[in-house]
Amino acid sequence: PVTLAIMLLSSVIAGTLAAKLKMHARLSAQLAFRTQILFDTHRLLQKARSQKEILEITCTQLARLFDRSIVAYAAVNGRLAEGHLFSEKEKAEDQSYLTLDEQQIARWVYTNKKRAGATTHYYKNSKCLYLAIRIGDQVYGVIGVPAQKDVLDSFEYSILLSVLNECALAMDNARNAEEKEKNAVIAKNEQLR
């Protein structure tokens, strides 16, 4: 009887330790995957030249990172362009994120420079959480993250904000480079006169 109790106790302890080890291995793999995506995002954004390319890279990486579709609206000439859906799968299937109501919420975010949509006080019945891609008062676009069964936890939300800030910085740098190039062409034309 004593041997049986000791064997039972040791098997319970070994099973518990094995389960904890398996959980830690899974969490470590998930953290490594997220870190790799963030590193790839940074590297790809450094290479990108146009604002459109920067937005596509950002949305594709966010879709991979969160394993859900991402809605993006680029700011063009002071207005939001038509939305695009970037899916974590090969083909984006759900167009319900691009309805007129959802576009109105994205425009509100663009105008007010505040987050809105699901999980917020503004437009809480929306299908997505909308955030502005911005630096200061300059807004470069709006990103929508669908609020599925599971909402973003605080860690995922902080990663989302970090990626959006990096996207905004890359877009700001691209805009500055375009303006510098235009000014150089104007100066060269003035010299030739």
Roles of regions detected by a PLM:
Residues 34-38, 47, 181-193:
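Conserved HAMP-HisKA connector
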Residues 4-8, 54:
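Hydrophobic alpha-helical transmembrane segments
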Residues 40-173:
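GAF sensory domains
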Residues 7-20, 159-183:
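Signal-transmission/dimerization alpha-helices at domain junctions
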Residues 10, 27-32, 101-102, 169:
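Short hydrophobic/aromatic-rich motifs at helix boundaries and adjacent loops
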Residues 23-36, 40-43, 60:
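Short amphipathic alpha-helical coupling elements at transmembrane boundaries
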